[in-house]
């Protein structure tokens, strides 16, 4: 038991982003993706472990791309294996893009007990035309395959995603497709946001769904997600789970 600052820490392994999603301004603000060298990452991680950090939250705009700008190879799995040798209790991963989740990475997550089986994988949408318009490299079926592979190989996995309601090109048909996808894949956690155009992005130049309609769809998606989480919560009633105590209160 200790203070929150020494118990858990967000640990950035890269800066910037090279994904160029059509609705996102981050690449223009922060520049292209730049991985920190493994030597520097591990040196800082050792200091955090020695200081008493028990949960290390590995973050970047896209941690799955780690290392590809250094030598052209995905190095996240190798980095995680090294981090798991240090004195952390849990290692949590934010954020993974589905098209760069390799078999080696899945095996590493499944095999390393310190890696929390909770993966945050933002998909934005599932409709192929919308994904293509937003410069996403995924398709609905490629996303579905990644989710199925992860669930088949990682026991007790919980998935979280981020979804944008009312993206350009989303009509009622595409919206219902998104609702159905959520129901079918039973994604346990989801952050749902109405589309809001950002100046300087491709999406801002496209025809928009009216904001009030985007908000209505957001609320409907939240309802869908509430049903999914209720079902999940009922499925784990009676389970005994390990928790990390960050502090205590007189109350």
What spans do the regions from the language model cover?
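C-terminal, non-catalytic macromolecule-binding modules
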Residues: 153, 173, 177-221
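Short, small-residue-biased leader/transition segments that mark boundaries at the very start
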Residues: 2-7
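Terminal RNA-binding accessory module
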Residues: 197, 205-251
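Conserved alpha-helical substructure of the radical SAM core
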Residues: 30-57, 78
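Conserved SAM/AdoMet-binding glycine-rich loop
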Residues: 50-172
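Canonical Radical SAM [4Fe-4S] cluster-binding loop centered on the CxxxCxxC motif
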Residues: 8-39
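Aromatic/hydrophobic pocket-lining residues that form the small-molecule binding cavity
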Residues: 41, 76, 143, 175-178, ...
């Amino acid at each position: 038991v200790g203070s929150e600052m020494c118990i858990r820490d967000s640990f950035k392994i890269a800066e910037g982003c090279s994904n160029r999603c059509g609705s996102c301004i981050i690449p223009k603000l922060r520049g292209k993706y730049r991985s920190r060298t493994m030597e520097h990452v591990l040196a800082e991680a050792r200091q955090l472990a020695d200081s008493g950090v028990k949960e290390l939250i590995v973050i970047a705009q896209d941690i799955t791309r780690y290392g590809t700008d250094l030598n052209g190879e995905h190095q996240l799995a190798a980095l995680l294996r090294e981090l798991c040798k240090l004195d952390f209790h849990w290692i949590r991963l934010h954020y993974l893009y589905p098209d760069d989740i390799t078999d080696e990475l899945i095996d590493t997550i499944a095999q390393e007990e310190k890696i929390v089986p909770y993966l945050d994988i933002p998909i934005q949408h599932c409709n192929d035309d919308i994904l293509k318009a937003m410069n996403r490299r995924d398709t609905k079926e490629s996303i579905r395959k990644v989710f199925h592979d992860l669930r088949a190989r990682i026991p007790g996995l919980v998935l979280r995603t981020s979804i944008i309601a009312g993206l350009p090109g989303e009509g009622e048909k595409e919206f219902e497709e998104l609702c159905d996808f959520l129901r079918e894949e039973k994604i346990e956690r989801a952050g749902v946001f109405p589309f809001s155009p950002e100046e300087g992005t491709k999406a801002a130049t496209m025809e928009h769904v009216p904001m009030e309609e985007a908000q209505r769809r957001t609320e409907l998606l939240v309802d869908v997600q509430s049903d999914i989480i209720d079902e999940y919560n009922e499925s784990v009633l009676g389970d005994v789970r390990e928790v990390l105590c960050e502090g205590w209160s007189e109350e």
